[in-house]
């Protein structure tokens, strides 16, 4: 019974937190910054496109964004920086590899004017395993193993600020992939950057945890996020 409990395990998102994501920080152009101070060059534009297109949420006629809280936060982030919702219409999805909790990745293929781009988002470690290059201030560089430590350091900094971090990558292809080619879609990617999102705690969560502590009950939080988050 509850009265004889010694340990209580709780999931985090939506139970201890409000499940209302907001993008707070961005790692792009070799640095982490608040979104208001981010350097908005071509690298940043690619990150925004990845946020908007590798995304299953929808912008409704009344301006509201419907979908998963993480994905709606990514679209809201782009719209607040004046990137138009028309980007989602003008770059239609022609193929996809849906998000899978085991892979911790999602990929889409979007086309425009006969050109196709694979956009991928997911956990940092999973993204880095699929990449062989990275964007660095407008150029694609291939010494990813040397640069990966700097990426992980910035990921750790954001996680230590209680931010949930998603990483983004892309590659250009010259045709719509066949069913066979879809198996290797998430390979040879170029790392773009990361975003850090805050999911505010519920006001009552802190008091509930304190009551458990005073009662001698150990509390355990269950989450798929980075340990530091």
What are the language-model segments listed below?
Residues 1-229:
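Conserved cytosolic headpiece of P-type ATPases
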């Amino acid at each position: 019974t509850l009265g004889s409990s010694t340990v209580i395990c709780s999931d985090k998102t939506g139970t201890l937190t409000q499940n209302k994501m907001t993008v707070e920080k961005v790692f792009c152009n070799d640095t982490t910054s608040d979104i208001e101070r981010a350097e908005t060059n071509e690298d940043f534009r690619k990150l925004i496109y990845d946020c908007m297109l590798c995304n299953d949420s929808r912008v409704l006629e009344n301006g509201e964004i419907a979908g998963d809280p993480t994905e709606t936060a990514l679209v809201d982030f782009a719209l607040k920086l004046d990137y138009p919702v028309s980007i989602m219409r003008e770059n239609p999805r022609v193929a996809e590899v849906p998000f899978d909790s085991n892979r911790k990745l999602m990929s889409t293929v979007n086309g425009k004017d006969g050109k196709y781009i694979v956009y991928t988002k997911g956990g940092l470690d999973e993204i880095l395993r699929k990449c062989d290059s990275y964007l660095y201030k407008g150029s694609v560089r291939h010494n990813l193993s040397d640069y990966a430590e700097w990426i992980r350091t910035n990921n750790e900094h954001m996680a230590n600020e209680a931010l949930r971090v998603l990483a983004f990558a892309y590659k250009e292809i010259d045709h719509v992939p066949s069913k066979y080619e879809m198996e290797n879609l998430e390979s040879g990617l170029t790392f773009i950057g990361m975003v850090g999102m805050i999911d505010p705690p519920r006001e009552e969560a802190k008091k509930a945890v304190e009551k458990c502590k005073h009662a001698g009950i150990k509390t355990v939080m269950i989450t798929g996020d980075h340990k530091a988050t």
